From Swiss-Prot:
Keywords on record: Carbohydrate metabolism, Isomerase
Name listed for the protein in its UniProt record: Putative N-acetylmannosamine-6-phosphate 2-epimerase
Keyword Isomerase included in the entry's annotation: yes
Assigned GO CC terms: cytosol
UniProt source species: Vibrio cholerae serotype O1 (strain ATCC 39315 / El Tor Inaba N16961)
Catalytic activities: an N-acyl-D-glucosamine 6-phosphate = an N-acyl-D-mannosamine 6-phosphate
GO function term, MF aspect, one: N-acylglucosamine-6-phosphate 2-epimerase activity
Biological function: Converts N-acetylmannosamine-6-phosphate (ManNAc-6-P) to N-acetylglucosamine-6-phosphate (GlcNAc-6-P).
Domain of life: Bacteria
Family: Belongs to the NanE family.
UniProt-listed Enzyme Commission number(s): 5.1.3.9
Pathway the protein contributes to: Amino-sugar metabolism; N-acetylneuraminate degradation; D-fructose 6-phosphate from N-acetylneuraminate: step 3/5
PANTHER family: N-ACETYLMANNOSAMINE-6-PHOSPHATE 2-EPIMERASE-RELATED (PTHR36204:SF1)
Amino acid sequence: MRPVVRKNFLNIEELKRFLNGQTVVSIQPVTGSPLDKTDFIVAMAIAVEQAGAKALRIEGVNNVAAVSAAVTIPIIGIVKRDLPDSPIRITPFVSDVDGLANAGATVIAFDATDRTRPESRERIAQAIKNTGCFAMADCSTFEDGLWANSQGVEIVGSTLSGYVGDIEPTVPDFQLVKAFSEAGFFTMAEGRYNTPELAAKAIESGAVAVTVGSALTRLEVVTQWFNNATQAAGERKCAH
């Protein structure tokens, strides 16, 4: 496997300094959306880099390759799969890791939860190390973060907090972000950061950086937020 170009970051401390207090933009259009095309993903990536985003989270090997050729900022690469016999969706296979590395990812993120999976999380973490990319653990609990740190995973994220149970919360998990930070982890806040105020609170809670997705790049989702609010207001007005 060829050496990975990490967008000029020689070590994790350099990347941490670069991302400190910054916004990472996740560009993952709604599946089947008119925007769910590589050309549009590349266009959004260029636009948010020009607006000041310091890193991107991109799904899919082909998308990562296309975006990597178009931007200068680091990419957190993932592959999402819907498996028939496992709840693991984010980068479940070593082959996914290899594909993302060759496509130009600086960081490769994976599901670090302790659930039934096709390949062990230890094997995935080691595979990322073998590529020369930095690893990011998408966690749901503090225990996931402890495990990731014990494996030498460089970045821990609150990505999956609230997404592995039956009831999905509506607000971010600031407590988990704070716990990761207080443990000394390179912490990425992610999950339900839908306003600038929430993103700022994540930094105040100890996150190095905040990943924002739906609020910036999923037009259908944001339109629904506005529609729900205006329609509810209209119903209240009519009730009076």
